[in-house]
Amino acid sequence: MANALHNIICLEAEWEYRYDKRNNKFSLNTEPLLNWLRTFHGCDIVYRHILNKQDLQYYLDYFASHKREFKKYDIIYIACHGKHHAISLEGEEGDIDLSELNTMANGFFENRIIHFGSCKTLANLDEVKRFKEDCGAKLVSGYEISVDAMTSAIADAAFFNEIMYYQNIGIFKNEASSKFRKRYESLHKELKFRVY
């Protein structure tokens, strides 16, 4: 087990996977993926389950007020439903757009990689660029369209697997020189996976 250059905080909402025929519609979660990353790469993981906007705000406030403790966690993985330039929490009325999410984070996203494991959150390029600039993120990644849970989990795993040993994460934005972008080109095109 090698030591990764990055560590992850995952904030995951409840998933009601409507396409699932099983009795347990709330059976999806990212914890197995995160455990695999921890075991394979030796990275540290903080996993928090959020049920509603208040939970999300609680954890963002906690992380922001304890920045020194969480300095080494430079990847923020937000796993939930999404809509055009917004995230959506199961059972909550309304969405949280990127601007509101940045306000809720209270500076915690600065100099971090923010990955959205959610449908359509990166659908509006102008909003994504504004979010990245306003929050000071190193990199913002995710999907422009509605994505299948299993296929997007594969893309998320590939992304985290590749990024673990890169200090210069800017290379992921360059389609011409990024081995990651070339290796998974067809998957990225299918899912409209974006890196900014």
Regions found by a protein language model. Name each.
Residues 15-22, 53-55, 82-86, 120-123, ...:
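Short acidic, S/G/P-rich loop/turn micro-motifs used as interaction or catalytic elements
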Residues 91-153:
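Catalytic cores of nucleophile-dependent amide-cleaving enzymes
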Residues 63-99:
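A glycine-rich, hydrophobic loop/mini-helix early in the fold
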Residues 32-41, 60-68, 105, 132, ...:
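Hydrophobic, Leu/Ile/Phe/Ala-enriched alpha-helical segments that form helix-helix packing faces
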Residues 153-164:
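Short, small-residue alpha-helix embedded
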Residues 94-105, 166-196:
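Caspase-like cysteine protease fold
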Residues 1-73, 110-117:
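A domain-level signal for caspase-like cysteine endopeptidase catalytic cores
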